[in-house]
Design a protein with these regions (language model features):
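Conserved ABC transporter NBD signature motif
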Residues: 10-21, 25-26
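Conserved ABC ATPase signature
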Residues: 84-88
Length: 256
């Protein structure tokens, strides 16, 4: 989709162009960030990399000045852009990488693992920027990530691809409703029933159990009533299934 590789088979059209065939024109309107590969020049100040990108993308002086100011403020990098890239922490560098990808105000930005290896503070800063720029500039963000925190914080639409085929295309809300079963952490006196309709015991110890219920088949209230009628419940905690489990269920269903 970035136009770097030629496909073995099939085709891809983005903004009316075939990325690898129309690469020179195509790259004018896209930005790319690779989590494990820097797009900045290593031994020079970040600002010098920005200046070089300005020339590469032929960004007018006024537009460059305005865009640079906007991005340095939004990503809080004003104090570090005069520092050589190699001297930056991973979180600082990633914020500068993202700024570089947005300098020419692209219509589409591909972010490959943008939060990989970042601490919690840096992850939040990157995610907040992505949400804000998407809302304010209507920039299309295509995100590839193994961090389910990114999925939960940023995603409106999920596309699942396996073995070269589109397996699923839907909203995060619809997926959550379909796959998000409730987890009941129960502390009790007595003995767990041998049969519990539409409920699965995930973990069990002497007087505690973690029970998953399928809300497409049984209501939460009915499940709790069943347990209350068969056990002396000391404590009950209700949790939603994590995004990790939802993704695992998708992989299982589509045999990826």
């Amino acid at each position: 989709m970035c136009g770097i590789l030629t496909p073995d088979s099939g085709n891809c059209i983005v903004n009316g162009m075939v990325p690898y065939k129309d690469r020179k024109e195509y790259v004018k309107n896209i930005g790319v960030v690779f989590g494990n590969r820097s797009g900045l020049w290593w031994d020079v100040p970040v600002e010098d990399s920005f200046e070089l990108l300005k020339e590469i993308y032929n960004i007018p002086d006024e537009k460059y000045k305005k865009q640079k100011q906007l991005l340095t403020e939004m990503l809080n990098i004003k104090e570090i852009i005069r520092t050589p890239t190699r001297q930056l922490s991973l979180g600082q560098r990633m914020r500068c990488e993202i700024a570089a990808a947005f300098l020419h105000d692209p219509k589409i930005v591909f972010l490959d693992e943008p939060t990989i290896g970042l601490d919690s503070t840096s992850k939040i800063a990157v995610r907040d920027f992505i949400k804000k720029i998407n809302k304010e500039k209507n920039t299309t963000i295509i995100l590839t990530t193994h961090d389910t925190g990114d999925i939960e914080a940023l995603t409106k639409r999920i596309i699942l691809i396996g073995k070269g085929k589109l397996l699923l295309d839907g909203s995060l809300n619809s997926l959550t409703k379909k796959y998000s079963n409730k987890i009941l952490n129960v502390q009790y006196n007595g003995k767990l029933p041998t049969t519990m309709p539409q409920m699965e015991i995930l973990e069990k110890s002497k007087n505690e159990a973690k029970i998953q219920i399928d809300e497409s088949k049984i209501k939460l209230a009915d499940a709790i009533n069943f347990l209350s009628n068969n056990l002396e419940i000391q404590d009950l905690e209700i949790k939603n299934t994590s995004i990790d489990n939802i993704v695992a269920n998708l992989y299982k269903e589509y045999k990826i």
